Amino acid sequence: MKAVMQLGMRIRYLRNLRKWSQEDLALESNVNRNYICDLENGRRNPSLEILERIADAFGISLSELFLGVETIEGL
């Protein structure tokens, strides 16, 4: 599975843990809701700035956001 898909699944998992809608995460992170949707579905390759905003919204570090995500394709 591609890293971008794994990252999207991780973001969805963290959002669901908090019982947040995509709109809730969008408001907390100042990221467009459609972008959040695309990100969760592996259709976006987010910038570091976007990832930092999302991690901050969840109250976690950037490294925690990537837990369980393979960062090297093909492994």
Where in the sequence are the language-model features?
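A detector for short, charged/polar N-terminal pre-domain segments
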Residues: 1-6, 73
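Short basic helix-loop element that most often maps to the first helix and adjoining turn
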Residues: 9-28, 53
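Conserved hydrophobic/aromatic packing and binding residues within compact polymer-binding modules
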Residues: 11, 25-26, 36-39, 65
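Recognition helix of helix-turn-helix/homeodomain-like DNA-binding domains
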Residues: 30-45
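DNA major-groove recognition helix of helix-turn-helix/homeodomain DNA-binding modules
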Residues: 49-64
